[in-house]
Amino acid sequence: MPAYPKNYPFYNWVPKPIGIIILFMFFLPILTVGGTYSASGTEMMSGLGIISEHIQFANFATSIGMAAFCPFLYRLGCIRREKMMCIAGFSLMYIFSYICAKTDSIFLLALCSLFMGFLRMVLMMVNLFTLIKYAGHMEATEKITPGNEPLTGKGWDKLDIERSAAQPAIYLFFMVLGQLGTSLTAWLTYEYEWQYVYYFMMGLLLLCILITFVTMPYHKYTTRRFPINFKQFGNASIFCITLTCITYVLTYGKVLDWYDDPTIQWATVGAVVAGILFVHIEVTLRNPYYQFDVLKLRTIRFGFLFYFLLMVLNSSSMFVNVFTGIGMKLDNYQNATLGNWSMLGYFIGGIATIWLSVKGVHFKYLFAAGFLFLGLSAMFMYFEVQGAGLYERMKYPIIIRSTGMMLLYSLIPTFATQRMPYKYLSSWICTMLTVRMVLAPSIGTALYSN
């Protein structure tokens, strides 16, 4: 990798602790800003006269945008222009947030959500790589550069141990920050109106742009050639169309009476045609956008299956929201406050995962423990509902489920990427997000809602 200025990406007058705080602060809008906010869903539905499926579909569109970015991960990491990418990314997110706050078009809302999901992943990865370089003095891209794989079995074992410790810490940080963002949006909706969530986030984006202007100097490209082939954005578009059609069918199927509705029929045809076209293009290209060879790896297939089971099971968390919302008459703010207990579960699960992984506990026992926690949470809910349920006791299934979620969330990628060549990493992350955030949740929601 090329050399960077001593205090990259900041001016030399910026103290290192302040720079670290700034980079951490940037994660708040990156992880929180979106086309829709679940915590303000009820108020948004009543304000716009829309149904809950519209909110779900927009949320899935955000996840599709995030997955569509992943094959560009390594090439984006090579650009390394924090100031340019933060200003451009935050500015575009500001524009899309403004459109989402003003529009009553579901199509426009979903389209902006998709773009914002793509931008979220761009900014998240750029900021994460920069933070690791700035605070940890480590070049993260070296750990994902094809050709830098360990050459011996001991080297791979050491890498697996490092991942077992690092990935739970990273997941813990992102999941806790995401929950804090949910609580913030719920509070804003409760105290003001749902539109004010967008306006607050727009103000936060402007603040981040201002801080970027003041604290970061201009940096030239570190390579002669721009690393991203813009032709592959066409492939990414077909990928997005395929997943959007699938999620449309699964989200609106019950409301529109499935295949009695022509839009469901056309969406199915669109998913099949776009899916076949995407596979054909990727298989025949010399430098594909998505490498299907990643699915030939046994650990990747198991990771795919585990994530699918995990997210289908986790979709049952909707029963907690239904019970607290309808049965206990709680509003979104109280639900979000109750959801804050998940941070305790994340912390317990994260610490336990790191400790047990370093101790060398076999994956099968850790996976069994994770799914056991999910089962215990569902069992607790069953008996609690039978006993009419108390608000004070609803925190226990949330803590138990989030502990199991943290165990599985952080361990499945570690298991799936064992001995995996780095050239497949971007395609694996795309597969992981597609299953974890799009396909499995949409299928799970369709199953439970029917």
PLM features per residue range, with description:
Residues 190-305:
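Hydrophobic transmembrane-helix bundles of small-molecule transporters
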